[in-house]
């Protein structure tokens, strides 16, 4: 998994709207949150929480992108259903998840499987990781990320 002071990969990913290129957003802070599956309870709550704080993130010159393995069409339905404002990346080939180290072995009811570990990366204007949240607990998380951005300053 990427760590503080690592440079983020200069990835390009399809979203439900258009391709998202990290290189187009250098000069802004970037929040990248990885979530397991669109339109499930925790992922919905997390995405709505970031949407509810969108104006505050915008004022701090910060772009937000949520990434899951869902295809762009599913991300589009997810956006429309909940009026989400953050970018939604479709990593259905698992390239970005692997680059960030969030594609991990998980276990549920004794069954092991591979999946996305809910994680968030805060990057500065140069694309350097400044904070990492692993195994994110959704309640209060978006607020915590916003506070970390404020602490980074301009």
Give the residues covered by each predicted segment:
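Chalcogenol-based redox active-site neighborhoods
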Residues: 1-154
């Amino acid at each position: 998994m990427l760590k503080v002071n690592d440079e983020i990969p200069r990835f390009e990913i399809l979203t439900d709207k258009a391709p998202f290129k990290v290189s187009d957003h250098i000069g802004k802070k970037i929040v990248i949150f990885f979530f397991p599956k669109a339109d499930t309870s925790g992922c919905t709550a997390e995405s709505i929480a970031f949407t509810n704080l969108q104006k505050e993130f915008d004022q701090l010159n910060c772009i937000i992108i949520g990434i899951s393995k869902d295809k762009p069409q599913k991300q589009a339905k997810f956006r429309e259903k909940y009026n989400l404002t953050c970018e939604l990346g479709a990593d259905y080939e698992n390239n970005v998840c692997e680059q960030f180290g969030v594609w991990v072995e998980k276990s549920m009811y004794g069954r092991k499987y591979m999946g996305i570990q809910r994680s968030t990366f805060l990057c500065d204007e140069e694309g350097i990781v400044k904070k990492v949240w692993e195994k994110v607990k959704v309640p209060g998380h978006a607020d915590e990320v916003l506070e970390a951005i404020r602490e980074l300053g301009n």
